[in-house]
Amino acid sequence: MRQWLLLKDILRTGWVRAGVESPESVAAHSWGMSVLAMHLCPDSLDKMRVIEMCLVHDLPEIEVGDLTPHDDTSTKSEDEHRAMARLAPQWLDLFEEYEAQETEEAKFVKYLDKLDMALMARIYEEKQGLDLSEFITSARKVIGETNLK
């Protein structure tokens, strides 16, 4: 159990690379997604499952690290699956559901993942005067234009 809390100490690699001062941790990102889920989850979805998926989808990063498109991700899927099986086998089904992107809940969690990133990019841009448009562009590929005004 204690190892799960290490997610609080892992900084989001993309923000570090972009020069963000005091970037959020991976755990803060998961929390942000969960709060967005509580507010935005459609009634047609299983809200508890969505929130649970938000909370555990990045747990493997405790062992694998927070990889970005700039990293070698050729073994990311396998590495993360093995890490999740070791760290929290009781939540492996949630992780696999998220990774497969076949259920509406998993697709919504992916949407929240990108929405949280885009919202944080805007916050960091406003507070720190950075150009984080690459993050907004990346998010738009998943969530569309209308949600990022």
What are these regions (language model features)?
Residues 1-149:
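Active-site helical microenvironments for divalent-metal-assisted chemistry
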